[in-house]
Design a protein with these regions (language model features):
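Active-site/ligand-binding loops adjacent to catalytic centers
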Residues: 24-26, 156-194, 202, 214, ...
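Active-site nucleophile and cofactor-binding loops and adjacent substrate-binding regions
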Residues: 63-76, 92-101, 192-195, 221-226, ...
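Claisen-condensing/thiolase-fold acyl-transfer catalytic domains that form or cleave C-C bonds
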Residues: 224-232, 324-388
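Alpha-helix C-terminal capping segments
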Residues: 79-89, 103-115, 136-137, 234-244, ...
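Buried hydrophobic positions in well-ordered alpha/beta secondary-structure cores of metabolic enzymes
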Residues: 42, 61, 73, 80, ...
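Active-site-proximal loop->helix
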Residues: 93, 101-164, 260-270, 381-389
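A short, small-residue-rich loop immediately preceding and capping a beta-strand
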Residues: 76, 87-123, 216-230, 250-251, ...
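Positively charged, low-complexity intrinsically disordered leader regions
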Residues: 1-89
Length: 415
C-alpha cells in the first residue's frame, strides 16, 4: 500500500505521518492553541487508593477525562480535523463505539468548520443516548450502525436484521461514504500510526510530570481496544527504555469478551468487516468476528494497532484480559477513594492497576504503578446502575464464531 492508495480517505499530510520515520513531528500552532483548553492534563498520586488497598505500591494516574469531550480522543481528533481543513475537506465520516471518539471528532469538527457524520455501533447507540446528544450538540449527525444508508450496512442487516453492530461494521460504513466524494474524508480514532503518534502527548507529559514528582514507573498500564490510549501513555516510556533508560513493564488491558491480544492471531487482516481497508498485520480475532455486547463499547474491536501488536511480539508489551464485572468493581473502589467515575473502558486500566498493586502487596514490593485514566464515565451511568443492581452480565465470546472468523483470514495471513 502506497500513499496514493490511501489518498481517497486521508489528507496527504496524515498519510505522510503514517509512514514517517521521524522521531518527533512538530504540533501545529492551531492544534496547540486548542490543546491549551485542557493540556497538560493532570497526573495524580492515588494516595487514598493506596491506603484503601493497603499496598506498598505507589499508584499514579494520568487523567484524560478533563478534555471537553471527556476522554483522550480529542488529542488526535483536533489534529486530524486541522489537517483535513488544511486540505480543503468539508466533511468527515467516522465510526464510534461508546461515543467517546464520535464526541471528540464532533468537537474538533466544530472548531474547523467541518461537517461530521458518525456511525455509532448500534448496541452503544441504544445504551448511551446522551453521548449521541453530545455529538449533536457539537453539530455532528449520528447514525446507528449497521444502517440502511450504506451498502455495507444493508449487507449486514440482510444477514442479521437484529445485528447489534461492531466497530468493524461502522468503519466499513464510514469508509464507504468517504470514498464516494472528493470533499469528504474518513477519520479513524485508533489503530493507525498517526493516531497513536498524536496520543503520545499523554506519555510525553507523563514523563515530565513523573520527573516533577521525583519518581518513575515500574509498570505502565492502559486499557486497549484499538490501542491509541495505551500507546499514548506507554510508547514514550518504551522509547526511553529503548534508548537506554529504565526498563518498565507496559501492560495493555483488554476485555475478556473481545481479547484480540490474548486470544487472537498475529496475522494480516482487514481493519473493517466489509473488507474495504488495506490489509494490516496485527493481533486479530478476524474481521468478520462480532463481539458480544458489553458496556466498554470503545474496546469492541476485532484487531489491535499494528505498532502495539509488533511491540507485543517483541516482548515490549504484555497483555491481560478481564470481564466487565470485576472491572466495574475496581472502578467503584477507585471512585470511592479518588472521587472520579471511570468510563467502562478506563475501568479496565483501573482493574489492571489494582491487580499490580495487590501483587506488590503479596510480594512485599514497593513498585511505582502509572495508569492512564482515559475518560470519565458520566455518560455511562446506566452501566453502573446495572452493576449496582446485580444485573451486569459477563458475556463470553462464541468460540465457534471465533474459530470461523480466524479461518476466514485473508490467504496472505498464512505466509
Amino acid at each position: 500500500v502506497g500513499p496514493d492508495d490511501l489518498a481517497p480517505l486521508f489528507p496527504m499530510s496524515l498519510i505522510m505521518q503514517e509512514v514517517s520515520g521521524e522521531r518527533y513531528l512538530e504540533i501545529p500552532g492551531p492544534v496547540r492553541d486548542i490543546y491549551k483548553q485542557w493540556r497538560p492534563s493532570p497526573m495524580f498520586r492515588a494516595r487514598r487508593l493506596e491506603k484503601a488497598l493497603d499496598t506498598p505500591a505507589k499508584i499514579y494516574y494520568k487523567y484524560e477525562g478533563v478534555s471537553p469531550a471527556g476522554s483522550h480522543k480529542p488529542n488526535t481528533a483536533v489534529a486530524q480535523a486541522f489537517y483535513n481543513a488544511e486540505a480543503g475537506i468539508k466533511k468527515i465520516t467516522t465510526e464510534t463505539g461508546a461515543g467517546q471518539w464520535g464526541s471528540a471528532m464532533a468537537f474538533a469538527g466544530a472548531f474547523f468548520d467541518i461537517e461530521v457524520q458518525v456511525f455509532m455501533v448500534k448496541v452503544s447507540f441504544q445504551q448511551k443516548p446522551y453521548r449521541r446528544a453530545l455529538m449533536e450538540s457539537f453539530g455532528a449527525t449520528c447514525i446507528a450502525s449497521p444502517s440502511d444508508t450504506t451498502q455495507s450496512g444493508r449487507a449486514i442487516l440482510e444477514k442479521d436484521p437484529d445485528s447489534t453492530g461492531s466497530l468493524g461494521i461502522a468503519i466499513s460504513e464510514a469508509v464507504e461514504l468517504a470514498a464516494q466524494r472528493d470533499d469528504t474524508n474518513y477519520s479513524l480514532g485508533s489503530v493507525l500510526n498517526h493516531v497513536l503518534m498524536h496520543q503520545t502527548v499523554i506519555g510525553q507529559e507523563a514523563i515530565k510530570q513523573m520527573e516533577m514528582a521525583g519518581d518513575y514507573p515500574d509498570v505502565v498500564i492502559g486499557c486497549a481496544g484499538g490501542g491509541s490510549n495505551f500507546s499514548g501513555i506507554a510508547f514514550p516510556f518504551i522509547g526511553e527504555q529503548l534508548r537506554g533508560g529504565k526498563k518498565i513493564r507496559a501492560v495493555a488491558v483488554e476485555p475478556a469478551a473481545c481479547p484480540s491480544m490474548t486470544r487472537g492471531k498475529y496475522a494480516y487482516d482487514f481493519g473493517d468487516t466489509g473488507n474495504l481497508t488495506p490489509l494490516t498485520k496485527m493481533h486479530t480475532l478476524g474481521s468478520s468476528f462480532i463481539p458480544p455486547g458489553f458496556h466498554a463499547g470503545g474496546l469492541r474491536y476485532h484487531g489491535m494497532a499494528p505498532l502495539v501488536s509488533h511491540a507485543k511480539e517483541l516482548g515490549l508489551v504484555e497483555a491481560a484480559a478481564y470481564h466487565q464485572t470485576p472491572c466495574f468493581e475496581a472502578a467503584v473502589t477507585f471512585a470511592r477513594s479518588e472521587g472520579i467515575i471511570p468510563a467502562p473502558e478506563s475501568a479496565h486500566a483501573v482493574k489492571g492497576a489494582l491487580e499490580e498493586a495487590m501483587r506488590c502487596k503479596r510480594e512485599g514490593k514497593s513498585e511505582t504503578i502509572l495508569f492512564n485514566l482515559s475518560g470519565h464515565g458520566h455518560f455511562d451511568m446506566a452501566a453502573y446502575t446495572e452493576y449496582f443492581a446485580g444485573t451486569l452480565e459477563d458475556k463470553n465470546y462464541d468460540e465457534q464464531a471465533l474459530s470461523s472468523a480466524l479461518e476466514k483470514l485473508p490467504p496472505v495471513a498464512a505466509s
